[in-house]
Amino acid sequence: MSYAALKAVPSASEATALLSAGAVRARCANVSEAVRRGETRYFRLVSNRLDEAARRVVDVTRRRYPDLAVPYHSRWRHFSTGGFDRAALIARGADTTETARARIDLAIVSVLLDAGAGPRWRYHEAETGQVLSRSEGLAVASLRAMQTGLFSADPATPWRADAEALALITPESLARAFQHAAGNELVGLEGRALLLRKLGEVCVRSPALFGVPARLGRLYDHWSPGDQPLSANEVLGTLLKAFGAIWPGRISLAGVPLGDCGRHPAAPGDGLVPFHKLCQWIAYSLIDPLQAGGLRVVELDGLTGLAEYRNGGLFLDCGVIAPRDPDLLQYPLDALSEPVVEWRALTVTLLDELAVLVRERLGKSADDFPLVKVLEGGSWVAGREIAFERRRDGSPPLAVVTDGTLF
C-alpha cells in the first residue's frame, strides 16, 4: 500500500473531531459558501431577504417577551404550554440533587421523543383538558408518561429514567402513553421505541457517566464535582460520545458512529456535514436543570442553531433560501439526501447571521442575548407562524421523510 493510500484512511481522531458544535458550524459554513458562489445543485441564497426574517423574529420576540427577558430555548418551555407549571410536579419533595437528576431524566427522554409527530396526531391531557399537538403535545405526553413510571424500573419512584425500564420500551407501550390510534397516528413509533431501548443499552455500558444501576439523571453527578463552570460544549461532547451508538443506520468513520451527520460534495474530505440536532437540543434543555442544581453553564454560543424544519422553514418561507427548481418542494425527500443536507447547512449558517441582525434591532449584545435566546424569542416560533400563514396545516415548506429519530 502506498503512503498516499495510508494517509487516505480516516483515523478515529478525525471522526471524533466531527463530534462537536465547532465541526457543525465549520462544515455548514463550507456548504453555505459554496451556495453563495453558485456551486451547489439545489438552493441559492437571496441575502437581501434575511432582513424580512429578522423583522419577523424581532416582532415575535417583542410580542412574546415585551420586557425582552427571554428564557433559554429548551424543552422546558414546552412543559409549561397553556400556562400550566407541569415542571413543578417533578420529584415533588425531593432534595436539590434528586430533583436535578429527575429533570435530566425527563429532558433527555422527552427530547429524544421530540421528532416530528405528524400532522394528524393530538394528545388529550386529562389533567387539564388541553388538546395538544406537535412539539408541545409530545413534551406533555412524555412528562405524563414519566409521571406514570413508564421509564422507571422502580414503581415507588416514577420520576426517573433508568436503563432497565428503557430496555423494555416497545412501540405498543409508547402507543398507549401517546394515545396513538387510527385517525390519531403518531409517526415513527418503531424508531422512537428503538431509540429509547438503545439509550438504555448505552447507559449500561457507561457506568462512569450513568452509575450503577444505570440512570440518565446520574449525568448530574458526573458534571457536578468541583467549583469550575461547565461549558455548553463540554455538555454536548459528553452527550455525543455517550449516545453515538443509539442512532440507527447512520454514518460511521473509523468505527466511530457520527450520529446526525450527512454528506455534501461541498464539504471537505469525505464530504461529511454533522448537525447533531437532537443532541444539541438535549444540551440546550439540560442548562435549566443543571443551573437549578447549582452548576454554572457557560459559553452557550459555542453551540449552534438547530437544523430543523421550523428554523429552516423560516428561511425558505421568507425567501432567503430559494430552490433552484421549485418542484423540489413538491415531494418528500430523504433526511440524508443531498438537498436536505444543503438546506440544513444553510439553516445553521443563517441562524448565526440572523442573530446579529436580531440583536442590533433589539439593542442587545451577544452576551446579553445569546443565540439560544434568539431561537426561543424567536426564530422557531416565527418559523411555525409563517408555515401556518402559507399552508393551512402548518406543515414545513420542505417535506422530509423521518423515522422519528432525526427531526
Task: Map each language-model feature to its residues.
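Extended, well-ordered protein cores
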Residues: 2-293, 299-327, 331, 338-407
